[in-house]
Each structure stands twice: as C-alpha cells, then as structure tokens.
Amino acid sequence: MDIERINDHTMKFFITYIDIEDRGFNREEIWYDRERSEELFWEMMDEARDHDDFFIDGPLWIQVQAVDKGIEVLVTKAELSKDGQKLELPIGVDKIIDIPLDEGIESLFQQELVEEVEEQAGTNFNEDGTFGFLIKFNDFEDVISLSHRLIFEDIKDELYSFEDRYYVYVEFDEVLHDEEEIDRILSIVLEYGEESTLTIHRVSEYGKQIVKEHALETIRNNFPAKT
C-alpha cells in the first residue's frame, strides 16, 4: 500500500486489489459489506499512524475512488465548530468551509458524526482544487423546482439517473467560490434533495448520464416551473 501525506489535514492511500486480497478481503465485500470495509479502513489508518504520525482526533471526510488496479482513498481531518453547530473542513491553504449540522441536511451528516468517524461517499475532493457534491432526488419534479430556484455561474453540474432516483453532481472551484457562497448554494440545493451515500464514480459507471453539462440550465430551459 502506498501512503502519501498531502498536507497536515489530508492523507492519500493507494492499495491494489492484490494487496487487498493478501489481507484477507475480496473486491466485492469492500464495497458492499460495511463491517469488512471498515475493518480494512482501520487497518489502513493504523499503518498511516505508524508511517507518518497521522492521528485521528475527530471526525473525518473520506473519498474512495476505484481505479484499474485498486482503490484510492483520500482522508481529510475535520473539526466541529466551537458552538457544535458546524463542521469545519479545510479545503485549501488558510481556507475552511463550514457545513451546518441541522435537520435540513441531516442526511449529509448524521448526529453520530460528532462522536465518531462517518464515511461521506457523496463528497469528492479533487487534486485540482475542486470539490463536488452528489445530491440525490427522489422525484424529477424536485430537480425542476431547484433549476428554477438557482442559477449556477462557473459551477459544473451534471444530471444522472440510477436505480429509479435522480442525481445532480455539482463541482466547485475553490478559487472562484468562497466558503460563504458555497454554504449558501448547498443550503438551497439540500432543500430539494439530500446528500447521496453513493460516489459519483459508481453513479456515472452504473447509472445513465442524462445531461453532461449545465444540467440545471438545460432543465430550466426545457421544463416550466410548477405554479
């Protein structure tokens, strides 16, 4: 397994499928068996602690991506705000995004996140300085309503369908969007949908891409707002 320290808050792991099998796991169970995937994860974190003194002292954000020969895992330390109402997540040099912990986005962070590590597969942190959110919608009408509520500028957005649900993937550039703007946009988006527990990689691979780019604009131009 390869371990790379990105910064004080983030570690990157790459583990091959051969290494995974040598540890007594198989490919299927690390994706579909929560207990076994957590067991593998904590093995990896133990090695990170021994390798580079990467200690766990609070909640984590975890991104898992499947590649040809194995999986890549990005682990970022986060902290609760002093009032316990927000999760403070480093997204760059001297930049922190505040995610409110309230009933409106309880699917994004469950209450136990305050006390223990919780995997959030729907959020993706990329090496190019962008990070994305995968939002699930139970009804296409909710996507239409959102498209007439928000107009995106310099934000990548795509629309997918998967297992009778709709998914909008939105991607922000930390250079173009400050944390206050991102907080505002996410709070509106999550009035209509909920943070997905799936990764964008799984939805894009096994689902159907409906709109490749400018998804909300395309929907807004083709579907009238409900009155």
UniProtKB/Swiss-Prot annotation:
Keywords: Competence, Sporulation. GO terms for biological process: establishment of competence for transformation; negative regulation of establishment of competence for transformation; negative regulation of sporulation resulting in formation of a cellular spore; sporulation resulting in formation of a cellular spore. GO terms for molecular function: protein-macromolecule adaptor activity. InterPro entries: MecA_C_sf, Neg-reg_MecA. Belongs to the MecA family. PANTHER family: ADAPTER PROTEIN MECA, ADAPTER PROTEIN MECA 1. Homodimer. Enables the recognition and targeting of unfolded and aggregated proteins to the ClpC protease or to other proteins involved in proteolysis. Acts negatively in the development of competence by binding ComK and recruiting it to the ClpCP protease. When overexpressed, inhibits sporulation. Also involved in Spx degradation by ClpC. The N-terminal domain has binding sites for ComK and probably for unfolded/aggregated proteins; the C-terminal domain interacts with ClpC. This is Adapter protein MecA 1. It comes from Bacillus anthracis. The gene is mecA1.
